[in-house]
């Protein structure tokens, strides 16, 4: 039986390590792993296009970027579980009651659901591109938000703006 060849593009080191461990345990799948975020992930797909890749696995904005530019290769999105989001929100709440979740839809949908179910008081902002992120975070900072929970682009941008950024990490169940 032919091995399935998957190009995995984790946006952060912890997910890279998790994918490497999963790859070591699977004999039916060949995982090619390149760490990257947004355009870096797209570049990895373009560089590996001739390597007979069956599908791409990534998260959030990186998966969306790949789908938008490479319609000939299926791109699967790792969606954080509600528990992944809850874990980060609880940590953020211990830092400040002025917090927001910012990210691509795969991050903000579970956050919205969690906010409604648990009746938590935090803002949720969905972005569609890296370019939108800074303006969104500046507005939240002007509204008094101190802590941002989100994806790689949101956390990196928040830290550049002097805000606290907490990455919502995906557990092994999500990956």
Describe the residue ranges of each PLM region:
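Non-catalytic structural scaffold of enzyme domains
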Residues: 1-175
């Amino acid at each position: 039986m032919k091995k399935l060849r998957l190009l995995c593009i984790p946006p952060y080191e912890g997910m890279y390590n998790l994918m490497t461990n999963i790859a070591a345990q699977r004999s039916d799948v060949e995982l090619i792993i390149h760490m990257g975020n947004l355009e870096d992930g797209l570049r990895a797909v373009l560089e590996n296009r001739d390597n007979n890749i069956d599908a791409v696995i990534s998260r959030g904005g990186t998966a969306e970027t790949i789908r938008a530019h490479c319609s000939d290769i299926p791109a699967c999105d790792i969606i954080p579980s509600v528990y992944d989001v809850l874990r980060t929100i609880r940590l953020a709440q211990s830092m400040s009651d002025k917090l927001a979740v910012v990210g691509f839809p795969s991050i903000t949908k579970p956050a919205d659901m969690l906010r409604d179910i648990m009746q938590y008081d935090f803002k949720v902002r969905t972005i569609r591109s890296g370019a939108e992120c800074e303006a969104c975070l500046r507005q939240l900072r002007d509204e008094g938000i101190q802590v941002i929970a989100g994806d790689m682009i949101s956390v990196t941008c928040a830290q550049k703006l002097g805000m606290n950024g907490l990455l919502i990490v995906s557990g092994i169940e999500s990956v």
